[in-house]
Amino acid sequence: MVPMWFLRVANDICIPTSRNTHKYHNLRKRPSASVMIDISRAGLNLKGVLIRGRVELIYEEEARRINRSIHLKYVMPEALDDVKVSSYLSEGDDVTVKVHMDRLISWNLTDSNAGKALSVGGWFYPLNDELASD
């Protein structure tokens, strides 16, 4: 999985999802996952983590509570008071995928031979606010 929104809680990664997704149905059949999180900020600072672990699917009130915390990480509290936003998020995100981290692998392209070659050669496009908004 490559989550758009997530929250780390202790040694777990929590990801909101819907019961209507292929992801949800696949995780019910096989409750394990790999999660890729890109923590790059800009330019050549290309870093991330790969998390592997067993999955627990959370429902009902606990899922609503966790998913609300995840949503508040990314949107202002006032957004959740807006009927359109809150109905979309609450209807769409009715399950929480909790990945219990069994293995964590970090990566850093900046320090790799490929990253150094690209950097020295000037082959990266600069990442800036203008490009990020396109």
Regions found by a protein language model. Give the residues of each.
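Short glycine-/acidic-enriched loop or helix-start segments at secondary-structure transitions
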Residues: 1, 24-25, 108-109
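Short beta-strand segments
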Residues: 1-19, 27, 34-38, 50
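Short secondary-structure boundary/capping segments
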Residues: 5, 25, 41, 87-89
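Short acidic (Asp/Glu) patches
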Residues: 19-21, 33-37, 76-85
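Charged, gly/pro-rich active-site loop segments
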Residues: 47-134
